[in-house]
Amino acid sequence: MARVTVEDCVDKVPNRFELVMLASHRAREIAAGDPLTIDRDNDKNPVVSLREIADETQSADDLRERLIESHQTQIEVDEPEEDAMALLQGVEQDRPAQDDMSEEQMLRALMEAQGQK
């Protein structure tokens, strides 16, 4: 049964290695609980996935996209603008308040803090 199914699928996916990748991914989806698009007929998940590809109830392009997405580890996220990013990170809160202390006043305050005068 499976050999006939593979030969039927080669028309839809000419590369046998890619066919194996797509069928195994679909078999994992079925095992995870995705609904079947054809009758099971006492076949196991890999055979069902090959039959789905052969009957074109699962398109190779859609399976390929889902396979690629399942292997992606980094999700692309739109980054906010640089100005908004600084506000979101609280950079404005980290800056000292505006002060009118001169250099001379600062030196005197430091000397007093150290106990010198």
UniProtKB/Swiss-Prot annotation:
Family of this protein: Belongs to the RNA polymerase subunit omega family.
Subunit comment: The RNAP catalytic core consists of 2 alpha, 1 beta, 1 beta' and 1 omega subunit. When a sigma factor is associated with the core the holoenzyme is formed, which can initiate transcription.
Enzyme Commission designation: 2.7.7.6
Cross-referenced SMART domains: RNA_pol_Rpb6 (SM01409)
Membrane-spanning residues: none
Keyword Ion transport (UniProt): no
Keywords, alphabetical: DNA-directed RNA polymerase, Nucleotidyltransferase, Transcription, Transferase
Principal EC category: transferase
Reaction catalysis annotation: RNA(n) + a ribonucleoside 5'-triphosphate = RNA(n+1) + diphosphate
Protein name listed in UniProt: DNA-directed RNA polymerase subunit omega
InterPro entries linked to this entry: DNA-dir_RNA_pol_omega, Pol_omega/Rpo6/RPB6, RPB6/omega-like_sf
Any one GO MF annotation of this record: DNA-directed RNA polymerase activity
Pfam families, sorted: RNA_pol_Rpb6
Record-level GO BP terms: DNA-templated transcription
KW Transferase (keyword) present: yes
Function: Promotes RNA polymerase assembly. Latches the N- and C-terminal regions of the beta' subunit thereby facilitating its interaction with the beta and alpha subunits.
GO cellular component: DNA-directed RNA polymerase complex
